[in-house]
Amino acid sequence: KKMMNGEKVAGCERCYKEEEWGNEQTYRKIWNHIYGDKYTELVENSTTKDGHLNTMQFYRWDFRFSNLCNLACTTCGPNCSSLWVEILEKMGNSTHGQKFKTSSQNKKLFFDTIIGQANIVDQIYFAGGEPLIQPEHYEILKHIDSINRIDKIEFLYSTNLTQISYKDQNFVEYWKNMKNLKILVSLDEIDESRLNYIRYPAKLPAIIENIKILNENLTTEKQRWMVTPTWNILNTHRIKNFVEYFHENNLFPQAFYQSSEWEGDIHNIILLHPNYLSISAAPDFWKEHLKKQLNIYEEWYKDQIIPLKNWHVRDVSIQRFDHEIKRFYNALNDEITIDSSYHQNMLEPLDKIDRKSTRLNSSHITISYAV
């Protein structure tokens, strides 16, 4: 009801803050643009004055079936990761809920509702947890394939890409038949030790091998994959190293050369929560260091990376790049107040990694989440 009256709501805080930093790709703006022509049909004609819907038509499915996940990322927590629940339980903390939080108490009712709308859906987004290890993802794909709509729907994934098979099914066989597909690979580091710390217990070689498989099999203009790091206080200073790794190992997707999409996606996610890992919450000395690293990155990217792209997309790619980098500076110029004790130990574990320390295990991760 508040939204219908043009009032801000607490649930949209993330979009408001990201738009303040200059993000033009927030969910709010994206869906207003894509489904704006359906406003009269879906909102005005279907919504009562008190905000209730008379009928519901699901043109877009946004699936986060449960918190089932095989990683315990430093920037995540038990609500979105079953592995985090397991780790916290081993620490004696059992107050964080179920290991597998489902999106519906009645799975049969949920699937009956969804299946009943399968003939009108035009976009499906799979997130998590980790969607590629969730049985519901597999069941949905099987049904969509059975009604011959795999090639008629736009599919979007957010995945850690640690594995691309479920039971005896390699999802690449489905993906090759999707005419409109985009896979967003959540990868925050290209150094094995640092990745294992930030996205425990991810193994870089396995992810890179799966990226190569995507490059080999997703060959059409509308079959794309992108990397979407979560930029935060622990990895933003290595943004140049990250892109350099993809360049030196010939890992750029085809879409990198053909559009400015790469510039938008790779810089899109600037962490807001947990706020003690946000670059806005960094101590002043670290903010100054990040600004210097971003300046070096800007010059290098325009000099070394932009010329690799097809000539007709270089100008728009520079414009997109400049816009996205400005968001980092806006975030650094913002301030989030947190307890000063966070700053005392925040960078210590990764400083040890930089000095080639071999002491790295899950306890570092639980400490970093708990500080």
What are these regions (language model features)?
Residues 5, 111-117, 142-148, 172-176:
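Leucine-rich repeat
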Residues 136-142, 166-174, 238-240:
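Distinct, well-ordered alpha-helical segments
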Residues 156, 178-184, 203-357:
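Conserved C-terminal portion of the radical SAM core fold
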Residues 1-101, 117-119, 309-359:
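N-terminal pre-core extensions flanking Radical SAM catalytic domains
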Residues 10, 71, 192-193, 365:
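Glycine-centered loop/turn positions within well-structured domains
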Residues 356, 360-371:
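Single conserved hydrophobic/aromatic residue that forms the stacking wall/gate
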Residues 58-68, 79-106, 118-136, 147-167, ...:
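Core AdoMet radical
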